[in-house]
Each structure stands twice: as structure tokens, then as C-alpha cells.
Amino acid sequence: SRKGFVYDLKSFSLESSFEYGSEGWGITTMGDYLVMSDGTNKLYHIAPSTFNILREVEVYDNVGPINQLNELEYVGGLIWANVWLTDRIVAIDPKSGAVKYDLDLSGLLSAAERGKLDDKDDVLNGIAWNPVSKTFYLTGKRWPKLFEIKVEIPN
């Protein structure tokens, strides 16, 4: 709908709404601003008070652009994004757009569980960070399970 909403943090009552010019697939906070994906290979650094785009960063790995960036989390100085219609999560340098780590999560669901899903869009689609346990929660569209994983980053 290209429309955003501002809610009161305590009462959750709607305070205002605003329009913006792109699709919003995923969003995360990074310091004093937001980072949003729109299903392309771009990440948009956004001022939260105005929703104006401050900067665009193109995301790429050693093969080329990474399109269909979806849900985002900012953890450990990197932006973690699931790549829609795949079993991948990529960890992105927010300044350069370079993929630093690429997680293959194709083994999360068993063959039997996968067989009950629609191959077209019942895919990995949710990523959330738990700062207490330092783990990610992962799930997908119509998946029967929620997974908690710990990612060990090499020094």
C-alpha cells in the first residue's frame, strides 16, 4: 500500500500515517535510522522522523547482485536478510553492500515437512534476533515450526 503508520508505544493507538514511494518488504533499526528492503538488491537507509531516503546501498556477493532481499535484522554490525524464495540468509556490510556471510538453511525442514508445503511461496520468510540468548528465530510462510539458531561468526 506504500503507506506507513505511527503508533504510540505505550497505548498502541494510531498517531499518524504517511506515504512513501517504494514497496516495504523488510525493515530494521540501525543506530539512529532505519534500513528497509523492497524486494530488489537495494537497501534504503531512512530517516525515521521523515521516512526520507538518506542513502541507497546495492547488495552483491562474488557472483553478482542479490535480489529479493526480504526480512531484515541488524545484528553485530551487519544487516541479516533472508532472500525470498530461497533458503538463504545473507549477512551484509551496511556501508558497502558486500555479502560477508551466506547461510544455507535448506536443512531446517525435513523432506516430509517440505512435501506438505507449496514450493512456490511456502519459503523461509521470517528472521528475528533475540539479544538475550544471542540467537536468531527463523520461520517461513505456513511452516509448521519456529527454529532458534545460533550463528558462530569466525574472527
Regions found by a protein language model. Name each.
Residues Y20-T40, V63-V75, A111-P131:
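Beta-rich, blade/repeat-based domains predominating
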Residues P65-A98:
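Loop/turn-rich, solvent-exposed surfaces of beta-rich toroidal or solenoidal domains
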Residues D8-F12, A47-F51, D93-G97, K150-P154:
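Short loop/turn segments that connect beta-strands within beta-propeller blades
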Residues A128-N155:
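Blade-level signature of beta-propeller repeat domains, shared across WD40, Kelch, NHL, RCC1
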Residues F12-F18, R55-G64, Y101-L103, L109-L117:
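A short beta-strand motif characteristic of beta-propeller blades
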Residues S1, L34-T40, A81-L85, L138-K141:
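Conserved beta-strand positions in repeat-built beta-propeller and related beta-rich domains
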Residues F5-Y7, Y44, V90, F147:
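WD40 beta-propeller blade core
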Residues S1-Y20:
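Glycine/small-residue-rich loop that forms an oxyanion/phosphate-binding "nest" at active or ligand-binding sites
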